[in-house]
């Protein structure tokens, strides 16, 4: 997903990210924002379809989805994540279609799908704890015991001396080139200061939403695209078992770290978060959609062994 300059977005980001010591932030794109054409645009914006996220998804629902994130004993990011930070971040991406595409059910499904990735990647729970793993999303905001610095040779985004690029954020970001790429998009110097993602929850959510809304490579779909149905698979995609649905979002986000490996635990766990959140949000897992898994899918972007996170 490309994004052209938005004055309102720039102003909003400057205000909400004032705590991060960096220059003004605006999202840029060569691609026009999607204009609603179904008669359900939000008041005041022809780009915002149906309800805004804050009307669809309220604070009590956020608390239902992430009830243990501030647990005194087990949570590692107590008092970091909150509803306000999520809504503030989402307001930047709503005009681009994030959870504002389609009718209300699709909007709720996309929220559940995105937050399922967040919950699965940040949980500190297991089947033995109160509520199971699904109650413990947003327990972390960074990788606790990094096994490496995640520094790779890259001409555009070279590693900064003394900086480690381990996982941080709502959907953890790894590797110097990913911090550089996301930082460029958000106009934040994440290459020199990746720690911003564990210091500012709004920025951490924005980085996750940017990953959701943005293709890894040109001429590929984003996770948003494959989920809401705006992507049409080619013959090669079909032969690679890549079809629209929640399964393809895992393919785009994680590639062959999860997909094409059969029904492995990490894939099944992410699906279980999605279905659990659908239930909590009143949609119901019976509306999970087709092509839930990526067990047989070939990766859009096969990973190099040294880049595995």
Functional labels for PLM-detected ranges:
Residues 1-3, 97:
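Helix-loop boundary elements of multi-pass alpha-helical membrane proteins
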Residues 4-24:
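Cleavable N-terminal signal peptides of Sec/SRP-targeted secreted and luminal proteins
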